[in-house]
Amino acid sequence: MEKSKKDGHQAVLNEGEENELEVFGYHTQNLRRALCLVTAILTLGAVQLMFYWRPEWWVWTSCIPCPLQEADTILLRTTDEFRRYMRKKVFCLHLSTLKFPISKNPEEPLVADHHSVINQAVMKPELKLRCIQVQKIRYVWDFLKKRFQKVGLLEDSNSCFDIHHTFGLGLTNEEQEVRRLVCGPNSIEVEIQPIWKLLVKQVLNPFYVFQAFTLTLWLSQGYIEYSVAIIILTVISIVLSVYDLRQQSVKLHKLVEEHNKVQVTITVRDKGLQELESRLLVPGDILILPGKISLPCDAILIDGSCVVNEGMLTGESIPVTKTPLPQTENTMPWKSHSLEDYRKHVLFCGTEVIQVKPSAQGLVRAVVLQTGYNTAKGDLVRSILYPRPLNFKLYNDAFKFMVFLACVGVVGFFYALGVYMYHEVPPRETATMALILLSATVPPVLPAALTIGNVYAQKRLKKEKIFCISPQRINMCGQINLVCFDKTGTLTEDGLDLWGTVPTAGNCFQAVHSFASGEAVPWGPLCAAMTSCHSLILLDGTIQGDPLDLKMFEGTGWNMEDSQVASCKFGMADSSTVIKPGPKASQSPVDSITILRQFPFSSGLQRMSVIAQLAGDLHLHVYMKGAPEMVARFCRSETVPKNFSQELRNYTVQGFRVIALAHKTLKMERLSDMDHLAREKVESELAFLGLLIMENRLKKETRPVLKELSEARIRTVMVTGDNLQTAITVAKNSEMIPVGSQVVIVEANEPGDLVPASVTWQLVGTQEPGSGKKDTYIDIGNSSVPAGKGYHFAMSGKSYQVLFHHFYSMLPQILVNGTIFARMSPGQKSSLVEEFQKLNYYVGMCGDGANDCGALKMAHAGISLSEQEASVASPFTSKTANIECVPHLIREGRAALVSSFGVFKYLTMYGIIQFIGTSLLYWQLQLFGNYQYLLQDVAITLMVSLTMSINHAYPKLAPYRPAGQLLSPQLLLSVFMNSCFTCIVQVCTFLTVKQQPWYCEVYKYSECFLVNQSNLSANVSLDRNWTGNATLVPASVLSFEGTTLWPIVTFNCISAAFIFSKGKPFRKPIYANYLFSLLLASAAGLTIFILFCDFQDLYRKMEFIPTPTSWRVSILIAAFVQFCVAFFVEDAVLQNRELWLFIKKEFGFYSKSQYRILQRKLAEDSTWPPVNRTDYAVNGKNGFYVNRAYESPEEVPKGKLKLEEQASEQHFWTRL
């Protein structure tokens, strides 16, 4: 590996990102390529088909390794556990095709931006660039860094100064043309794939290829009816798949196409404004925002402000205010300057600009940041086009099981070869019969049968108003054992109700103003803050914005209006929002308040602020609102009441949503200076005004659903952006934290100059004050959780980040009992879900889609309660806006999983049953007849496979999950035991029939019916070596062995279908599946009828020989005994949960899931959980474990962390 990197053969693409790839350079050799083509022709395309399935084989055989710089073929490999390969051709872009001269001087940059990779990728004097296109993204070879670099975006290394001054005046026409050629068009084009191409992709699926081989073989042997039935079913399946793919392609194409043809206005350097089609935009262009527009690219706002609807990307329909990137002189990268809050300056592609507010310069301008598939919308579309593969053990086990069945078939193949060669049968017939036995073990109906269960489950979910865009995830829902819930809008109501305000005066809280009286807030600084500190906008005469802001504003009784020319003392025009008292407002000495500038709220900063002017006032005023703990940090300490923490806790423990407000006077000489003020300067030295108290009620469905999940032993976790105390109270009120359980708050702090990173454990106690309501406090006295009581960890996003950075080895131990995660940013939510997955939890995530898109996408089953377009990144969407959808989905997932296992076991047994019967007949060169196969394959197996999964989910969630592994001992024993039973019965009847006095090897058909069956042995005297003539049934089919084995095999198939159709506790009983029950009863009745009837035409058609009635009764008894034994073993032994738990306990078998191992370990640790103490990281500032890949709460790496490597050897603590 290291050698490959040193010689330039290997590099990494998108290093540290979710879509990280390893790239290898190869050079095509014509001789090797010619040999591959000749081999493909000689093998009739078989080798070419293998190359299609495994592109790396084609590269390894037709190319030789070489440095990437010289390669014409690139082999890419994902760095995840799947290690998938892709092959890409290197192509060149020639700048000489441009219509203006290009300098060939290596010292002269091609574009003005000295950070641009374009300057480092151009080969001079050839004037060409080497490129590859991977999943819609173009990469160019960087000769300086010796790796492929992404184009179509501005480099992150640009500073705020670079953005404003390098690109502030626009690009020249020449630079636009260069960037246009290199970066490609600014369009997100989803090709509507031709039907023939979709068909080819479906048909070339490995299983369909094997199926085609099998059906060709069967058709060549005259087995037409069943082959035609399978062909029809396969064609229907392929057509439906192609239709679905085509519809999705058309829908996605229509969704993105309209954004490719937007007319926009840009600024061209030295030429002024110019109109052009949006597909011609390039990174660095200056985009003019005239008003309402659908953004065709990602852009950084540099002048003015605007309000956008980001619902398409975030699922949040609340308008978001964007502010310009500050003009600073430092060289810090612009994203680092704005920390995780850089998104407040970025306008994302696909979002709608609904209002613009020009600055003093008169225009709202933005620099194009990313184009095409590099944009936020492009990334969303790519996530749909190239979804992350499912790492579900069921599918891996299914593949292994198929390989095992194929191996059994190979054994049968050589067995058939040996038998037929021993009897000197012609080679062609020998090969054909051997191939027939090979194909018998893998049922061709298997893929359709496994798919049909998900189709039924999908339809049942649709009736519950749960929509699914990823049906293969339904089975995964059956394994969910942990569900993360957002709080606001998910567990609690969307809307907030005003409860009251708690103003301050003279460093003390004053009397509460209650909104229950119906009176508006009395005039004062607190009222002024409530009227102005919000992100509300007036759109078409309607006030729109965040529900919290709306409720707060309604409580003041003031009205809003837009003023395009707002007068102020500075005498400058500006587009501003003006607030005036309404008829319900308290009496005020102020006629109006003008909002001049806004610093928007973000989940990372947990605050917002505005600069406003009161009518008649000579000064400007700053108002701030946000999380109380955050706002208090920016206030002068003498203005914050001494009992601030206690007062805040009094309300948060009751489940109230608490917002703090603050204010200061801003002295300025010129209004133009306001636009250049840094947020840090504005938000400092404020005076604390008071608290706004709002109620956030639980939804009525929350408590019953959480109780149902708890009884089913499914862990529930709250992941919210709200206050920690509020989250704890909601968790207790909803009984997410059961009555009697203890809560331990985990508070972690970053390392200081002399103090290492630390983590403090505080036990939250509960007491009953005199008022009768429960209060929550920090219990300092206790040093451990009381024995016998459960405990739950609660922490904030800040603490989670510190733990992730400095105490990563301890994080899994906390997560095993972590229940409340508050003040979590979107990136932290995604990271938390991933960390739970590393502990082998199957994680469900339920949220309203606002800040949960990443977590919904990361979870095994993301359930969005939002109907916005962003939910396309979530596998499931519920139109019912409460969490009742979660148990519905889990129930259907469990039922679908059990159905899949049942169908898989049945079809496996069906293959083995037929394999054993056919092998026995092969011993004497015989075979079942076509109609015998047809009845088993079509009337029984095919219909069973299509109806077994119709069974509905059981209405109550069981307190345990269904088996999730096909290779589990129970399932393997089930298949093995049933195989043994059917083998014993078939072999015994096969040998016993030979011992009957009336037995002979071959009979003349008509004579069998002329004799008295009860006296058959006395009346029939035929030569055992008689071979019949052309008018008789072929000797290879007509035999007593075949006539005996066929009903045994058929009854075995019916028995297996009944035994494996498991009902309670995950599905309704078998009799509730009316169609399936009727089918089994009909199949059993038909088989008995054929067994005992004496219709000559029927026997001739079925190719049977009549046998004595006593023998037929013996066959029925043998089949019934086999059914009883198999049913008893399956139901009383293999499916006996208590018995298996006892066996596991006696033999010391325990779950190998990481969370189970940790639970057992912690249960034996008397010092866990630590309470009322502080632990420090021993090796100073970096703690005992540092994850270097973790950069920020918004950019948490995916799948790059390894839990086991350092967890054991670096677990050192010091205690305070």
UniProtKB/Swiss-Prot annotation:
Specifically expressed in brain and stomach. Its main location: membrane. Belongs to the cation transport ATPase (P-type) (TC 3.A.3) family. Type V subfamily. The chain crosses the membrane at residues 33-53, 198-218, 222-242, 401-421, 433-453, 896-916, 933-950, 971-991, 1040-1060, 1075-1095, 1113-1133. One of its GO terms (molecular function) is ATPase-coupled monoatomic cation transmembrane transporter activity. Glycans are attached at residues 650, 817. It is a multi-pass membrane protein. GO terms for cellular component: membrane. It is found in: Membrane. Gene3D superfamilies: Calcium-transporting ATPase, cytoplasmic domain N, Calcium-transporting ATPase, cytoplasmic transduction domain A, Calcium-transporting ATPase, transmembrane domain, HAD superfamily/HAD-like. Mg(2+) binds at residues 848, 852. It comes from the Eukaryota. It catalyses: ATP + H2O = ADP + phosphate + H(+). It holds the Pfam family E1-E2_ATPase. Keywords: ATP-binding, Glycoprotein, Magnesium, Membrane, Metal-binding, Nucleotide-binding, Translocase, Transmembrane, Transmembrane helix. Coiled coil: none annotated. The active site is at 486 (4-aspartylphosphate intermediate). Its EC number is 7.2.2.-. This is Probable cation-transporting ATPase 13A5.
